[in-house]
UniProtKB/Swiss-Prot annotation:
It comes from Caenorhabditis elegans. This is Nhr-229 coiled coil domain containing nccd-1. The lineage of its organism: Eukaryota, Metazoa, Ecdysozoa, Nematoda, Chromadorea.
Amino acid sequence: MESKQPEDIHQDCELKQDELISKLQHSQQNFDNIKKILANFEKENENLADENEILKTRIASLEKDVKQEKNATKMAKSLNEETINELTLSEDLIESLKKQFQASKIELKEEILSKNKVEKDYSNDKRYFLEREQYLLITMESMESGKLEHEQQTEIMNKDVEELKIRVKELEATDLSEKNIELERQVGKLTAQLQDFESSRGYEQELILSQLEVQKRKLDKQLIDLQSKLERNPELVEFDKLHEELQTERMNMPVQVCYVHVSFIHKDIENLIYRKMNNNK
């Protein structure tokens, strides 16, 4: 094997040195590149860490939103159930109100019919009272005229008796016994007629008064019935004052004056009915 010369060895060393330097430079360049890559990796890692925190925050926010959405869904479901229950209750309430409305219509119709019946009954009672009043007034006028006629007849007969007594005294003075006896008979006859007339007149007056008493009791009963009708109907309660006035006046008046006063009370009732009908129109 041929030995190398020092120059060759030196040249080989330089070549190897250059080669090593070149490799070292290349390695240094690779190391710098690796450092840059590592720096980029670190930077990207930091960015990824920031993005990871952002993602964690977004995930937490999304979880919170999901939880709120679940709660909102649950509340909406509960609200929906409450709404359905309220709708069911509203439908039941509407049905109940419809039934109450129908019942109110029926009650109103019955009340109107009852009111019309009461007004009709009251009109009939009023007509009956007016007819009764007319009858009583005619009866009282007849009684007054009969009373005047009786008084006139009594006055005439009293005059006849007085004249006969005067004639008897004159005959007694002339001592005419037969004529005196005849005149005494006539006087006795006229006196008996006068007594019969007085008794018959008293009987007729008692009969008329008894009839008036019967009519009074009937009228009292009619007034009591009418007052009970008025108490059952609040709209006609205003008439009760007139009936109380009529009852008070009837208790404090004689029979004849009481029946005359009835006409004035019925006129007040008639005016009150007329005003009530005008108000209803």
